[in-house]
């Protein structure tokens, strides 16, 4: 069933397919051994294991489809009584209910035992009505409960090992990273509150755009949350964190200002690696400025020195190479530029978005991305609608009409 899901369903990210195939080998081998061994006792552990792993690897709707397919495969492959099949249905429904709003791996430690217990209760009740001997019912019910416990422990343990071994972003791991109370985001909020709120806005823009074009919205949102964590190194050098403090850049050279600003990308990669963030998220951090030039300080330095090369003012990249990374890259530029607008209306926002995106296309920053021209248009339209809503922008004629009504 896991292998079938790899072919028919799209996991959280292409890299995750490798991890899922590893899990398929484990679960498939267990089912094969249990099928040969026969009996109820060993069969339920791999069933619950694969069911739980579905919620680790897939979004919830896909995990539900995966679970239904798994029940059918188990019913066909493993000769178990109707009482057990009925119990499995209830157990699977229990997993769906428990995992429906789960955002942490610890939920699996609850879902597995509860599923095993509910399956055992249904099996016991139906077997009792069918006249099965009590010792047999008790033994098999115990096996079912144990199967849920073992599956939960194995799912959590194996997922942790695989995530660390292959450094991939499972759906459950990404959901954990969305918790704004975790240590890294809490530190960002405390030390760089302006950057923190900017990151939330970027995440909202990137995730919404990802949903519109069928990209991985969950990865885009997480990437938006963490893309600027490198600013923790020198938060006071970035305007959104300055507040009422003096502008430190007025007292230093444009070259030094640029050096500190450029460093935040590599600092973010270092911090993310130290906190064991998935490789896909680290890629977004590394690529969120591409190879663009820190234009303000380049222009400032050029005014002081003629024929100045822009290379010393250029981010090292690489350029964004996935749709999710590109969306964060574009959302970052658009959100930052929007905050600097003095006149906030639809025409100004539309011109700003067109300008930011066109400049990046012309500069070749999207050359390695996977976005089509049609998708870029969809993204721009979404950015515009989202920013209009966020800034409560009204058309000029509506504002004038309201003013007349209130006068």
Specify the residue positions occupied by each region the protein language model found.
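Conserved catalytic-loop aspartate of Hanks-type protein kinases
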Residues: 1
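Generic detector of multi-pass transmembrane helix bundles and their immediately adjacent loops
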Residues: 6-196
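Generic recognition of stable, solvent-exposed alpha-helical segments in well-folded globular domains
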Residues: 48-52, 64, 85, 89, ...
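Generic, well-ordered alpha-helical scaffold segments in large soluble proteins
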Residues: 52, 56, 71-75, 92-97, ...
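A short, terminal or domain-edge coil/loop segment
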Residues: 98-99, 275, 338-343, 401-406
